[in-house]
Amino acid sequence: LNPQNYDGIILARETLHEKNMQRRVVERLRESGVPVISVGAKTEGMGCIEFDDYHAMSQMVRHVICEHGARKLAYIDGPKEYSDAAKRAQAYKDVLEEEGVPFDSHWFFKGDYSVEAGTYVVSELDRMHRIPEAIICANDCMAAGAIMELQDRGYRVPEDVLVTGFDNVSIAKDNSPRITTVDCDRETMGYRACEYLMTKTAK
C-alpha cells in the first residue's frame, strides 16, 4: 500500500492484529502526509472516531444485574491486543463493584472473539458445575457460541441463563434466540470518517 496513491485513508487499526504491524502501518501513514482518520482506536497524530465501549458495556452489565436480578455473572473477554476488549472488561468489573456483586475470577474467561471461544467457556463452566445466571460476552460471535453450547447441554436461553453480546453484527440477528447486544453504529462511524476526510481533502 502506497499512501501517496490516495487522497485520504480510513484506518481501522484494530483489524491489524499484530502490534508490530500496527506500529509500522501507523508510522508509514504519519510520514506520508496524507490525511488519515482512525476508526475505533485513538492514534497519536491522527483524527479519531471512537465508540464508547466502556459506557455501553457498563449499561449492559447494569441492566442484567438491576433489571434481571442476576448476581452470578460470567464474562468472556476479548483478545488482549484489542483496546475495545480491555474497556469492555473493565466496565464489567467496575459495575460488579458498584452494584455490590463480588468479582469471581473463576467466572472471568479469556476469549478470542470466535464462536468457538463461547462454546469452550460453557463446556468448562458445565464441567465445573458452575453455570451462572448470566454470561456477558465481549462480542456477538462468542455469545452465539455460548448459546449454542448451552442449548446443546439442555439449558434454555434466556429462561435458565441470560447471554449478552456486543457489536450487533449479523450473527446477533440470525441467532435463535436473537442475541441481546450493543449496537456500535458502525455505519454512522464510517459516514463521519468519510465526512472528516472530505473536509481535509477539499480543494
What spans do the regions from the language model cover?
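Bacterial carbohydrate/catabolite-sensing allosteric modules
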Residues: 2-8, 15-203
